[in-house]
Each structure stands twice: as structure tokens, then as C-alpha cells.
Amino acid sequence: SQSVEEFEGNLIYGAVCDEEGNSGGMLNLVPKLAKMQEEEHLEYLALLDTDYMTSEFPGDENKYVYVGTVGKLMPTFYVVGKETHVGESFKGLDPNQITAQIISRVNLNPEFCDVAEGEVTLPPITLRQRDMKPEYSCQIAKSAVLFFNYATHCSTPDQVLERMVGVAQECFQQVIDTLNQHYRTFCNMSRRPYVRLPWKARVMTYQELYTAVKAELGSALDEMVREKSEALLARQDIDTRVRANMLVEYVHGLWSDKDPIVIVYLTPPYYPHVYVEGKSEKDKALLAAVDKAVTSTQTDYKLVYKKFFPYISDLSYGAAPKDPEIIRALKRNTPGFGIFYDLPLKEMQALDLPVLDIGPFGKDAHKFTERIEKHYTFEVAPELVYKTVMNLLHDDPQ
């Protein structure tokens, strides 16, 4: 504002709410940005956020500028077991044992980190695990649900689904093998004849479940699921995660096949990763602008720029995958997509922006000791923002 005559270009400011929840503010802003882009013939260069950043590990003295952002999926396992009375425990199949095996296999396992250009996501971690038994009784649970927070740098929804289907198949079979070992030992101890337990490891995606049920019910299933989805949307006592689970439970309940199975699907929300690879002209321009801003800023802080903002943010909605197969897998395996959960995918694809975060530095986010470092936050970060913006807008960047 002190040198307006030197400023070339435009800044569009969006004040968005709900970033910590479902990004409702950003998801409402995206269509407006896309509309302005078309009607005003604007050429957007980048999407900038000023979200909080902190040390990435104990003793980390770096102050980061992030070009790109991590993505988030929530692969979910709806596990159908076989109910039985606790007095006949080997006649049933406990779904909790299967979810426990999956947790042991996946939770915080670096095998499932996503790596791009040497930058590594945090491994998946459990966000919900519970059985669906509504009350206490001496009957074991019939079903259970489990989902993970799964961070991505380059993996797509269809790839993560395929990976998790493989995990579910592996873990289900391990549970069956373990149960048969335990049952054999029990039979020997109690002098009973051993007969191998009848369970088969079966896994399918939500899309495959839907196809199987539709083969039995025909096109009537589409209307039934739409009506159920709208009824779930009308309920104010449950959130989107629960709605998705209840819809899967409903569709499975319509199927004639009642044998144990694991249904793998995606629970909302979905945050696409934005990988600024440097292949497009916009990518190259943003990377150059940030590099010049970082190298020209005189400070005692060690400034470092990295490819992925490591925390979930609204930056994810500045772009979306364009491969129709990826979008198809996302929609068909996210229960309720288009009714109680939706994304402005076409507008996100139209924006297709490289993104960056230059924010305040602080510690202990979401704790009563949360605080910021004043000098970096109010002196250095604003300078980096200013220089990056000016570098992008000027033909002769400073």
C-alpha cells in the first residue's frame, strides 16, 4: 500500500472459515474464484496461504516456506464378522480381531509413507476404531469400522484404495490362520476333534459391493441409496463420517450374502495433495519467485523452502486430479458423494494452481501454551510474502 504505483497485477483476498473442520469456507470460495477467472479473464498465478508452521523435529532451527501441500485420504474398513454367543466363541468371527490386525499392520508404519523428492509424509494413524454393537450383551459384535488418516504426496485415491485392499486381504487371512492355530490348540487341550474353521478371507471395495447388490436389485438400488443418503443428510445428530459408515452398512444389509467380509472405502473429507513439480510454466515461475525471495531476505534465521506444507490445509482445493479414472474411483468409493459430501472438482481442475504457504512461526499448536515467535512472524514472514508476490507479478523480479 506504500508503493501502489509500482504494483502491477491484482491480489484476491479470501477470508475462509472452517479450515480445521471440513474447509466449508474454502469449498464455497473455489467456485467463485473459478467464475471470476472465466468472466473477468483473469490469469491466476498461484494460491498463497499464511498458515502456521513450526519446527519439524526437536532441535530444528529452520524456518520453512512450503511450495505445495500434503494431501489427505481416510481409507476405511467396514468389517463384517459372524455373531455368536460368548459361550460358543469359536462359532463366530470377531470383527474387532480383524480391525486390530489391520491397525497393527498399518498404524504408524513407514511402509505407507508417501515419498516425493526426498520429502516424506507421516505414516497413517488411526482416527476411529469401534464395533457397531449398540449395547452390552453376551453376543460378540457383528461388524466394526476402522479408518486412518493417510497423508499423500503423490499417491492417488485409486492407488491408496488398491493398497488398502491388499492390506485387508493379508490381515484377514492372518486372522483366519491365527484362529485356526488357537482352535487346534484348544481342541487338543480339551480333547475335542479339530475341524478347520470355515472362514474365507474376502475383501471388496465399496464400488464392488454396490455392483454386487445392484446385480440383485437392479436400478432400484440407485433410488434407494439416494433416498437413504438424503435421510442421513437431514440428521443433525451425526457427522459426515458417521453418515458414510451408515450408508455402507445400509447397502451391505441389502445384499443376500451375509458371510464375513471387509469393505474398503473412502471416508470424507478428501484433501488432494498439490505437488509443484516445476514442469508447468506456473510451477517454474512460483519456484523461482520463492527462491529469489528466500535468498534475498537478510535474516539470522535459516530459511529453507520445501515442496510440501506438511499439515492439512485449504491449499489442497486450489487444484484437483484431472485423470478421469482417479476421479471416478474417488466418487464411486466415497459413500454419499454428491449428496452429503461433495467437492467442486471441475472448478478445482479449472484453477489448477501451484500453491505455497508462508506463515507465522510458533509452537504447541492447539495447546494452552500455543504461542508465536514475534520477530519472525511480524517482520520476516511478511517480507517473504511481499517479495514472493512482487517476484511473481514483475517481469524483472527483485
Segments from the language model and where they lie:
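Flexible loop/turn segments at secondary-structure boundaries
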Residues: 20-24, 54-57, 85-86, 154-157, ...
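An extended, acidic, His-containing surface patch that forms the Zn2+-binding/catalytic region
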Residues: 184-398
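An acidic- and aromatic-residue-enriched active-site/binding cleft used to recognize and process polar
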Residues: 16-19, 51-53, 80-82, 267-269, ...
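Acidic/histidine-rich catalytic neighborhood of metal-dependent amide-processing enzymes
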Residues: 1-68
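Extended hydrophobic secondary-structure segments that form protein cores and membrane-embedded regions
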Residues: 11-17, 47-49, 127, 262-266, ...
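Short glycine/proline-enriched loop/turn "hinge" motifs that connect secondary-structure elements
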Residues: 4-6, 65-72, 136-142, 254-257, ...
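Midchain, well-structured core segments that form catalytic/ion-binding scaffolds
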Residues: 38-246
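Alpha-helical metal-binding/catalytic segments enriched in His/Glu/Asp
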Residues: 1-26, 75-79, 86-109, 148, ...
